[in-house]
Amino acid sequence: MMDVSSSVTTACSYLYFPIFSPYIIYIQVIVAKLNSHLVQQKMDTRFTRGKSNILERPLTRPKTEVSVSAFALLFSEMVQYCQSRVYSVSELQTRLADMGQSVGASMLDVLVLREKNGKRETKVLNMLLFIKVNVWKSLFGKEADKLEQANDDDKTYYIIEKEPLINAYISVPKENSSLNCAAFTAGVVEAILTHSGFPAKVTAHWHKGTTLMIKFNESVIARDKALDGR
């Protein structure tokens, strides 16, 4: 289909008759207005066609799920991407933890709003239970297997997963047997704790399956004891 406006514009550009020049100028003005109208119409169509109402959706909408195969593919690609840019297992785990921290920081506010109606926890144990139950269900569709406290250190807690989904589809070569890709999950947990006002260092270890070791700052435990003493 011929574009009428472009045809008229082309004709006016290449033909010149002195007698009719006022009319040609008039025609050019009309064509310019027509072009402007067509451009505006196209822009209106572009921005209204299939208009997304994402800003109007409530944050409390039902949670969506991703297939395990899609997760396995994406996570394995993440691991390979990181592996190609490091020279040791510790560097690889650090990169995975950094990626996990980005995820944890992004999901915290929405998760607190959906699961806790915006209420933030102030006690260490309640915060850890929130992670064990709510965060784990949001990430993996189930609660974490266990939450334990170290016998000899009141700053240290453990979240234990016998068969973590994060490692289910990762094949670790013998020369890198110390690699635990749950460092990504450790990063998620560390970011959630830190951004919630519970600064801690979280690391992943092979023990009883996979264990996330959470070591809180002294200030967190001191504050918790002060709250207990009120």
Q: Locations of the language-model features?
A:
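N-terminal accessory segment detector
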Residues: M2-C12, V31-L179, I221-R230
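Mixed-charge, glycine-accented linear interaction segment located at domain edges/termini
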Residues: T185-P199
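Long, hydrophobic, amphipathic alpha-helical segments used as structural scaffolds
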Residues: L111, E143, S196-A200, A204
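Intrinsically disordered, low-complexity regulatory regions enriched in Ser/Pro/Gly/Thr
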Residues: A150-D152, K174, C181-A182, T194-S196, ...
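Broad gene-expression machinery/nucleic-acid interaction feature
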Residues: D154-T156, P199, G209-T211
